[in-house]
Amino acid sequence: MFNGGYGSGNSFNLQNYAPIDPMTGIPGFGPSQNAQQQQQQASAPGTSSGGPSQAVSGASSGASMKTEPVARQVSTAQMKRDLEQAAVYVPTPIPEGSTQPQQRQQQQSQPQARQMSTQQAANLRKNAAAAGTPPKQAMQGASREQGNAHQPTAGQIPQSSNQPAQQTHNVPRMPQPLQQVPHPSPVRGSHPAAQQVQNAPQRIPQHVPMPQGVAPHQVIQQVRAPNIGASQMVQQAPSRGHTGAAPASRMAQQPVPLHQGVAPHQAAPQTIQQTPARGRPANAQLAQNAQQRNPQQVPMPQGVAPHHIPPQALGPHGAAPQMTQQAPARGPSGAAQHAQNAHRMTHQQVPLQAPVQGPHRGAPQMAQQPGPHGAAQHPSSGTVAPMHITSLPGNHPLNRTHLLFNRQVVPALDIRNLIAQHRLMVDDFVRAQICYRLPENHQDYWPPGGHPIPMQQQQMRQGAGLPNMAMPPPPLMRHPGPHQNPIHAMQSMQVQPPLSPDQMNMQMFQQRALMMQQQAMQMQMQNPPPVHQQPPPQQPPQQQRQKQQRSQPAPARVPPQVPSQVPVTGGVAADEPPPPCSYSPVAQSSESKIEPVDVKPRVAPVPPQVPVTPTKPVITNNKKKRIDVVTLDEDAPRRVQVKQEIPEVSSTSDATKSDAAPTARGAVRIKQEVESDVAPNTILISAKKFERMKAEAEDKEDMKKKIAALQEALFNIQEERRVEKEIAAFATTNQAVPQNQPASSVQIAQVSTSESDAPGTSEAAATETMTSPKTKNNVIVETEGEQEEDEDEIPIKKSKKRRAKIVSNDEEEEPVRHPKRRSDEKREKRHVSYAESDDDMPVVKKKRRNQSPEDPEYSAASPSEDEDDDIGSFVVSDNEDDDADSFVVGDDEPIEYEEEDEDDMIERRSSRKRRSDSRSKKSATPTDRRRSRDTPTGSRSMRSTSPNDRRKSRETPPGNRSMRRTSPSDGRKSRDTPTASSSMSSSTLSYCKKSKETPMSYEEIEQQKKAKRQRNCKTREENRERKRLAQLEELESSETTGVRRTLRSTQDNSDPLDASLATTIEEFRKTKKKDAKSSENRAKEKQKPMNKRPTSSASVDSNDDGVHIPAKRMAHASSVPGPSRSKPPMIGAVKNRPNHTEMLDKRNKESEEKRRKDRDELERLRNKKHTTEEEKIKMARLQNALKVVGKAAGLKATVKKELTGSPAKKQKPAPAVPKILDFSVGRTFTAIRQTAIKLVFDTFLERDSPNAAREAQEFELSIAKQYTDGQKYRINIGHKVAALRKENTSGILEVNKNAVSHDKILAGGPKDNCTVARGRKTHVDHRQLSIEKLHPLLLQFKLTTSELETNAYPMRRDGSTKAVSIADTVYTQNKKMFLDDYDMSRNCSRCNKEFKLSPNGTMIRSTGICRYHNRGVAINGKRDTFRKRYSCCNEEFNVALGCKFSDVHVTDQLFKKELSTFVSTPVPVPNDQRSTRVYALDCEMVYTIAGPALARLTMVDMQRNRVLDVFVKPPTDVLDPNTEFSGLTMEQINSAPDTLKTCHQKLFKYVNADTILIGHSLESDLKAMRVVHKNVIDTAILFRSTRDTKVALKVLSAKLLHKNIQGDNEDAIGHDSMEDALTCVDLIFYGLRNPESIAIREANTNC
């Protein structure tokens, strides 16, 4: 709705949509004016019609003369809705002298009721134009002087819902302090005008040369207004506020003539003197409010005019006119930059660069951007509109070199130059985007806020008498309200009213505070902190690439940069020179020409403050980390300087790892390095070449590496100290040094006991230990006191505090002991640990007897370390000191065990018994998981002490407890002095307590979980150790009893013979007890673990310190110590695994036991009178499992003839079933063979054969060798067994079950209930029936028309005599069965490969060209052993290659022309005998070039008589006679007398259309004969399988008829068509006798 006061005059008029009343008088809501009217108003500001007030209100030049109202076109409700959706408007601030608000309603509805005349108004406008005051403000001031008659009340002034109440007040307000000015956040309105404001292009200020003698803040910069000549300049001031706010008051300027030859954008600025409005508040209340809002009254300097006050002193709602000020740049989000960055935008004396794009070359770039309504927007002088710099889409072709600058595609180089020339503020993200898209030779890096200030410009400003400020005073921002942002460019082309005295005072106050702040920052930079406290240098990711490209020349289009005033970001005051540094430029003479220099800031690096944790030292890897030289400085502060060489690595991670680890150190060299004390925030201006900059970068990298090496060196020194202290303490406790200890270790370990016991000499003893030379380390630490001083001065705060705490603990006379270190007071098993490595052999270090596993030496590494360094500090590497050789067990040297004295052993055993009651808590120190799992951990029981001793230990200070430890049994002297590990444990405890107060991090939680798992693992190890020790004690007690008995017998009888006899008897008793145990009890005994140390039954080992480590890898087995040599092996031998026979016996026993239980349960259920359904189901299941037959299965009873008078014989138990002989034969159906041999064996038993088992095995093996297929074997073995049974029953008479005995007939029987003929089944022999009686019975087996079509029988459509149609089946649906004459491609029916005929139509022959399986797939095995195998070779399906080979491919595809050669059977004639005939036929085919062809036709009747047997010669060449299936040879085919035509003639003599033909898969026979017939009985469909598939005739014969046909795979005899036809006849008779066998077919037919 809002047009903004400019645009096309005829396209938009608000009066056509909104009423005049009540919002007409608000500026910005009047009718729009075009650009020409705006130009006239700007060029003639002194006219009565061109006042800014009218321009703001949107009225035309003659709006004041119009009196006729404008007709309304919409309702008031519609107008209100439109106003609510419009952008929020804020009226122009009214000057101080005027307090009355504008009354829009009175100005529009009653224009004649004004208090002054038109002539007075014109005069006021002229005076205001001469004095620089807007005419409307002058008119308002004059009206206020006349009176307040027209002041509206609060109810009369219409207010919007979005306007605050403070808009009605016109009292100027003092600005807030600069640091407290809040940033206005733009409100994204839904109105289009608000969206256009947010997307408004950024306005770039134009900087022009400064006139001599004029301060920068007094210059009003000008740019050319739209559609105005080059000589007309208009000032534009920004208006900050909410999105959609109204513009400030405008002021038109006189045109300034341009000099000849001067471009419009280079025109010199003109200073405009503005006189503030002289007026006072309308009433005393307003004046009082104005005074309350300006509490700080600063006196005006003498000689300073109000219009000379810089614009920074204006208040947020001041009434005084405001001069030009620069608004901070806006980012893409629309938020303003921070107020502190506003003062860094200075005017540079550099001519503007030509615009990148746009029609006008003389105007700046942003002047060409279209406005919200299509008009061009022009930025004002000194105004920085929001910059919107974004990247182009990824698929844009200019994405790598250009950016989207305020909706314009601009090269990144031009944007960089524009930002550098105007000193614009950009954020890091925009700067990174620009640098990424700069050319290679322009990718320089500038810091935030522009470039540093050259010293020559500072000197020039000091010589000119100007204040030596690096920047103009920061612009005084008005208080940003929620609705004060400009909505378009025309609103910002108004001049703020002049400053008031209070605002000028506030300006001076702010300038004074800013200068004091700068002086304070300069003082801070002159006294910089030490170098070691400076932060590390942070370089951008692309800095290295920018440095390499910085020395290349700049392109020709970039103008040379002239040193200008730039802000100082580091806080250095502008009136003082920068601090001296090594990078300051050399002073040049005044005659020398200024050359462009590469100005880059240099910030002195500060090493990071990384805390050093002594309790968790960093474990370094000797193979990955290298430190060449470690030197110690003598001057204060003492620092450890580390020199490293950069390894050549391919990645940063490898370099970091390789630089962090120490290697063998060289000789000690003391070196001093000069360090420059430079403040961390000091900016150093360097004008040196690229080589110096590169050297500087390398120095930074070296400094970083030195800092990292310093950290590692400190950790190494602390670790060495701790190890040496522990060695010294250990040497003190163990006075006797082993003989095989090296000389260097002896030198370190020899410390007098008196010195270690005395509190005052403990430090000297440690010092003496530290000063001893070492053989392998090259760094020599002089004394502990001196080194502690060095460490106190290390500039690392956290590590310094922790180190001081550790040192104080070491220097205390009574160190605090860890409350959980009670395990040091007992003797426990030594721990031996080893490290896993992929390259090195594991090195084992023994744990001392009196040292606890909680010590830091045995603690795990920090969880933050790498996996390669997680071994722990307890591993002794190859290059460690010689003083640790006593703890290392080599590969070739034996393990020596320390012996305990008898008192210690007794005391340890007594404490072990009381361990369950008084058991100390376990340590929470995390240990390595692998080490805790593999290394056995000793017990932690305390020594037994009396109550008095415990009471004394509580009263004794912590430091003296270890000095007063005594044994309750023998009151010996105190053992040892406290070691360094106790102090370390105390510090660790204090640190843990502190860490509990703060919330735990993720790493700490994981560490606690890890410690908990380790404690659980340790508990399990202790339990196993206790059990082993209990067994050992039991064994020792038994041995002690035996010894005592021997001693008693020796004392009683001094004869040695009696003693030896008693010993022999005792050994015999033990052996007898062992033999008395049964085998089952021995198997149930729990075997001892193999990895435990074997116990001895012959001797007692007093030291009890055997070492055993389970070897994880066989490659390191030689380095792992073996078991104790003094211990015998385990007593119980491991039982061998049972063999196959034993396993079978065990399974048979279990099976028999289960069958016995099932029989008992079945018998119990049978004896019950009443059984439930569940019990019946259970009985059926048991009967099935036991194979119990409930009823008689046979209908005939067989009676054996027995010799009369034969005595009754006792029945013998059934002999065992023999095993099969050869497992290699029929390996796929072994289970079937085992079942079959049992049947054969039972049959031979019935024959009373003397060697039934052997005969049964041989008989079964012969059948298995003959039939290699499982299915054939199962069928034939059944036939053979049936034949054997018939031979056995040859002498037994069969008696019919329904027959009546002769005695009953003679006796007569009861006549009343005679049931001779009732219910008797009569058996009909269908074979004896005549054909006339048999024909009606066979009609039910005929195939229907749908079945004929489905099974691909040749059919004629609608009685047509043309070509027949043959449907596709599941076997032929993926094959093209009928081909065109020109098609030469074929598919082989055997190998299923595609081949082509020769061009002349013949077949190509080649040796072994076709490899195939001649039999189908058989399914063998049950569900768990289900396999598909070929019946021909018994190989696995889809895996084995073909077992047969042929020289030619064959096919069953036919030409399409063959479909027209089919003939139908003749139509029956009256009284035709052929109509009642039934024949069974079978055909044999051979392969020809034209496909399968008929070679033999055989037909029989139902009485099994041969009717027809014809041999047919095919019309084309025969490729393969297919002898193995057809049974025909090439000689028979070539000598065949008949052809297909003669065969048809012979066939039709017996067959007509009503004759029933029987066959198996008869559709293939009819296709070969080329005959169409519908009365068909197909045995393949009649006896289908349950899976609805066809069953082979051979299988049906064996299964139903128990007859084998078609020979075998191996004999290659082939099929006999006569045999197949007779088999079909037998199957039909079987179906008549057993109608249930064809029920499946009927069900399928009904479906």
UniProtKB/Swiss-Prot annotation:
TM ranges: none
Gene Ontology BP term (one): rRNA 3'-end processing
Compositional bias segments (type: Polar residues): 143-170, 736-756, 1038-1054
Exonuclease domain residues: 1477-1637
GO function terms (MF aspect): exonuclease activity; nucleic acid binding
The entry's keywords: Coiled coil, Exonuclease, Hydrolase, Nuclease, Nucleus
UniProt feature, compositional bias: Pro residues: 527-540
Gene3D superfamilies hit by this protein: Ribonuclease H-like superfamily/Ribonuclease H
Low complexity: bias regions: 30-64, 99-131, 274-297, 515-526, 541-555, 650-664, 761-772, 977-992
SUPFAM superfamilies reported for this sequence: Ribonuclease H-like
Region (Disordered), start-end ranges: 1-199, 274-393, 515-619, 641-665, 736-1174
Stated name of the protein: Putative RNA exonuclease pqe-1
Species for this entry: Caenorhabditis elegans
